[in-house]
């Protein structure tokens, strides 16, 4: 009774007001799984293709009717009757139907919508939570949230080069308390920014987006907020960055426009090293550009023993690219984004590779999100230990935190909030 009897896709809006794909999968037993696909702003060049209509007369060319049609007219007829309990088989069928390396024929947004909706339908049919369906009986670790409370780069209309300034409430005794600590710090930061006459408008991921004197000033404001909220920087709450360095990599150099600096790879690593020393940073994501593998190797060798070095654009959740990165000593952690690779199965394969290779995993949202909470369940399902899902504002971000609170409640004494940040 877990066979697919109907598949329906539609065009909806994401958190930026841009179209995205939503898919319903209906099973013979009568249950329905629904999923909405996220979209990124700063994207890796080797991500699976997000199909857009390129029709300037609709949504400024960003419509997704072609992807919707590919679900309804191409994918659906081929998977009617397919058993959703065979997620790997379903995903492989769609990958084979597409026949391209980057899912450019059908669109990763079309394929992923079906993949996620099918997983959710199968969980409903089994009358178990999604995290249990994906992760089995061992799914029990709640993730430490990486909360993006100051936005810059491609995520905000301000002068900060670094894209995300995050807090990690790893000193909390539970996920619920971690969310509380993060919210208190977020609201304290808002009061501080207001007092200083700075903007408290928020960026794509719900963090504040003020114009500041430097990237370092953003860190200093966050430290002040942590302390004024009653917590200890580096003890109760840590700090992490997503540099998104590919966005300011120009002609082989790194250009900090806000500070009038042009840096080599080595000089940029020197800069990060000074930040780690002065501010006790715990994690830096995409510290170098995705094509600067020599710089990545240097940063990993110099800072990898004292810092989580997360690869996002450099790996794009792709098991083949990630495998090469592991062999060449690139980073020690991987960011996991479902829509970078385009199926649930391939995402799980990449996570398994990370675990087997001693890399940490961080489950992540995209800057263009919806109310869908799939990644919250995924983080618990794979015992990732960390999740990146934005700030403590905007319902598209808060929805994931609320789902994690529900999961923690459901797990009860069986749930674990990590004592070691980098599980």
Swiss-Prot record:
GO MF terms, alphabetically ordered: magnesium ion binding; phosphopyruvate hydratase activity
Binding residues annotated for (2R)-2-phosphoglycerate, in chain numbering: 163, 337, 366-367, 388
Chain sites annotated for binding Mg(2+): 242, 285, 312
Cofactor note: Binds a second Mg(2+) ion via substrate during catalysis.
Residues at the catalytic site: 205 (proton donor), 337 (proton acceptor)
Entry-linked InterPro entries: Enolase, Enolase-like_C_sf, Enolase-like_N, Enolase_C, Enolase_CS, Enolase_N
GO terms under biological process: glycolytic process
Keyword set, alphabetical order: Cytoplasm, Glycolysis, Lyase, Magnesium, Metal-binding, Secreted
Entry EC no(s): 4.2.1.11
UniProt enzyme class: lyase
Pathway connected to this protein: Carbohydrate degradation; glycolysis; pyruvate from D-glyceraldehyde 3-phosphate: step 4/5
Catalytic reaction(s) noted: (2R)-2-phosphoglycerate = phosphoenolpyruvate + H2O
Family as reported in the entry's similarity comment: Belongs to the enolase family.
A Pfam family that the UniProt record links to this protein: Enolase_N
HAMAP family hit by this protein: Enolase
Lineage: superkingdom: Bacteria
GO CC list: cell surface; extracellular region; phosphopyruvate hydratase complex
Subcellular location: Cytoplasm; Secreted; Cell surface
Species of origin: Desulforapulum autotrophicum (strain ATCC 43914 / DSM 3382 / VKM B-1955 / HRM2)
Cofactor(s) the record lists: Mg(2+)
Protein name in the entry: Enolase
Main subcellular location of this protein, as a coarse class: cytoplasm
Function: Catalyzes the reversible conversion of 2-phosphoglycerate (2-PG) into phosphoenolpyruvate (PEP). It is essential for the degradation of carbohydrates via glycolysis.
Family annotation (PROSITE patterns): ENOLASE
């Amino acid at each position: 009774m877990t066979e697919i009897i109907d598949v329906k896709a539609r065009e909806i809006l994401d958190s930026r007001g841009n179209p995205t794909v939503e898919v319903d999968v209906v099973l013979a037993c009568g249950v329905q799984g629904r999923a909405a696909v996220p979209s990124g702003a700063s994207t890796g060049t080797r991500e699976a293709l997000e199909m857009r209509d390129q029709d300037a007369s609709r949504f400024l060319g960003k419509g997704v009717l072609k992807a919707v049609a590919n679900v309804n007219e191409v994918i659906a007829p081929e998977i009617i009757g397919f058993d959703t309990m065979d997620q790997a088989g379903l995903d492989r069928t769609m990958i084979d139907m597409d026949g391209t390396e980057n899912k450019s024929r059908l669109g990763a947004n079309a394929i992923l919508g079906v993949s996620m909706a099918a997983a959710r339908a199968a969980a409903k049919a089994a009358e178990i939570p999604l995290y249990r369906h994906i992760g089995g009986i061992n799914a029990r670790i709640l993730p430490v949230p990486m909360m993006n409370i100051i936005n810059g780069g491609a995520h905000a209309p301000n002068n900060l080069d670094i894209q995300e300034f995050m807090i990690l409430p790893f000193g909390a005794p539970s996920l619920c308390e971690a969310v509380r600590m993060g919210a208190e710090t977020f609201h304290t930061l808002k009061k501080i920014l207001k007092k200083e006459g700075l903007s408290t408008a928020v960026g794509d991921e719900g963090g504040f987006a003020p114009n500041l004197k430097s990237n370092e000033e953003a860190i200093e404001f966050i430290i002040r907020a942590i302390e004024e909220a009653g917590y200890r920087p580096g003890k109760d709450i840590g700090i992490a960055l997503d540099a998104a360095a590919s966005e300011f990599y120009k002609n082989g150099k790194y250009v900090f426009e806000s500070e009038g600096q042009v840096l080599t790879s080595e000089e940029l690593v020197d800069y990060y090293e000074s930040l780690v020393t002065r501010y006790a940073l715990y994690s830096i994501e995409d510290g170098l550009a995705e094509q600067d593998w020599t710089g990545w190797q240097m940063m990993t060798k110099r800072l990898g023993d004292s810092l989580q070095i997360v690869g996002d654009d450099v790996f794009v959740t792709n098991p083949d690219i990630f495998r090469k990165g592991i062999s060449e000593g690139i980073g020690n952690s991987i960011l996991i984004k479902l829509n970078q690779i385009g199926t649930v199965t391939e995402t799980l394969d990449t996570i398994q590779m990370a675990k087997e290779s001693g890399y940490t995993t961080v489950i992540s949202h995209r800057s263009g999100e919806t109310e869908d909470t799939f990644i919250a369940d995924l983080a618990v399902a794979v015992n990732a230990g960390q999740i990146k899902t934005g700030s403590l504002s905007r319902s598209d971000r808060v929805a994931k935190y609320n789902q994690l609170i529900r999961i923690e409640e459901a797990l009860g004494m069986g749930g674990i909030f990590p004592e070691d940040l980098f599980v």
